Amino acid sequence: TAVKELLLEKQETFLVPAENVANVMCLNPLSHAALVLSQVRYSKIPVLDKGDRFVGLIGLTDVVDKMFDLTSVDFEKLNEFTVADVMEVNVPVIGESWDLEEVLHLLVDASFLPVVDDNQRFKGIITRKEILKAVNHMAHELEKHHLVLPKSEEEMKVI
């Protein structure tokens, strides 16, 4: 369809490559994760294992929750735990040959989607921001290149 073609025109810009995405290793101490998360603009970042395989996500709230008990804040607690102790593990991921409809559906509830190869190796992320840029491009270009006409009552019944 014309809409899908226009959306996918900028497809090469959708993937932020792994080397440009902040991440932490699952065995890193939480103190390291806190440092990395405080330096990046993402609320969550990917967690990888030694083989660069995607294993989960971690956010600043996951780290901060471990620092608090009922009466105080203990920064030393961050050295007692690893990223693996608090990371989110049931995270939707997509393969390198992803489907646009699936990506759009998943990005409703996530600001980005991890992209992995067949061996779960982390390849990068597709962000909601990049998809919205493509939607904006499509909205501006659709009527420049295509005649958009309303369907008749009869044509609408066919759907």
For each feature predicted by the language model, list its residue ranges:
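Tandem CBS (Cystathionine beta-synthase) repeat/Bateman regulatory domains
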Residues: T1-I159
